């Protein structure tokens, strides 16, 4: 859960699918947490996938991404592992040597986000959508990263849980370059971060 002073730079980035233009000549610098806002289908997920290196832009470049803590559009949890085990996958070798201590901290974090003993004992495939989302968000926050890229991390959470998750995200992200894609206006208000609009 490191904090860095790097800057994420997007330079003249464009993405087209055939004749459809998602964004064109997009340039911005992200050095603090920010919300990436646009209605569904306007390219938020595609932009994050480009920043993660999972998709190529039509043109333009990206600098300063470094190591990424990510919440994907799909949760991408290991279905046979528990929530705690999924989060522990991102522990560094140093942390893994003291994994008992860190596992207790991870468990406490999951409890704070509303996973009870029953949920903590289940494999990820049996968790609800909201429980999976909370696990994915916590995994991103535990990763040793230079940048956080979060695609709709509050999906499936009720308002009370979303507020707890947003508070944890604000506390853990610090001033690390962060892009959180959402069209949820309540989440935007809760975070209080600057908003970058697509489209």
Predicted regions and their residues:
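Helix-to-loop junction immediately C-terminal to a conserved catalytic motif
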Residues: 52
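Q-loop/switch helix immediately C-terminal to the Walker
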Residues: 81-95, 105
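Conserved ABC ATPase "signature" region
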Residues: 101-118
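Conserved ABC ATPase signature
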Residues: 123-127, 131
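Hydrophobic anchor residue at the start of the ABC signature
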Residues: 137
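Conserved signature/switch motifs of ABC ATPase nucleotide-binding domains
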Residues: 143, 174
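Catalytic Walker B motif of ABC-type/P-loop ATPase nucleotide-binding domains
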Residues: 148-152
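Helix N-cap at the start of a conserved alpha-helix in ABC-type nucleotide-binding domains
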Residues: 159-161
């Amino acid at each position: 859960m490191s904090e860095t002073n790097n800057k994420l730079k997007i330079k003249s980035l464009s993405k087209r699918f055939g004749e459809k233009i998602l964004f064109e000549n997009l340039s911005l610098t992200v050095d603090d947490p920010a919300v990436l806002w646009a209605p569904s289908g306007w390219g938020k997920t595609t932009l994050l996938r480009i920043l993660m290196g999972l998709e190529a832009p039509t043109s333009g470049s990206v600098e300063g991404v470094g190591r990424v803590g990510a919440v994907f559009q799909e949760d991408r949890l290991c279905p046979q592992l528990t929530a705690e085990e999924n989060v522990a996958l991102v522990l560094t070798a140093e942390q893994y040597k003291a994994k008992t201590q860190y596992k207790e901290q991870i468990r406490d974090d999951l409890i704070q986000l509303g996973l009870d003993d029953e949920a903590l004992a289940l494999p990820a495939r049996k968790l609800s959508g909201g429980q999976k989302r909370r696990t994915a968000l916590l995994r991103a926050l535990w990763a040793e990263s230079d940048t956080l890229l979060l695609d709709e991390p509050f999906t499936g959470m009720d308002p009370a849980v979303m507020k707890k998750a947003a508070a944890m995200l604000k506390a853990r992200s610090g001033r690390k370059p962060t892009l959180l894609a959402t069209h949820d206006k309540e989440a935007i208000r809760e975070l209080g971060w600057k908003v970058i609009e697509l489209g």
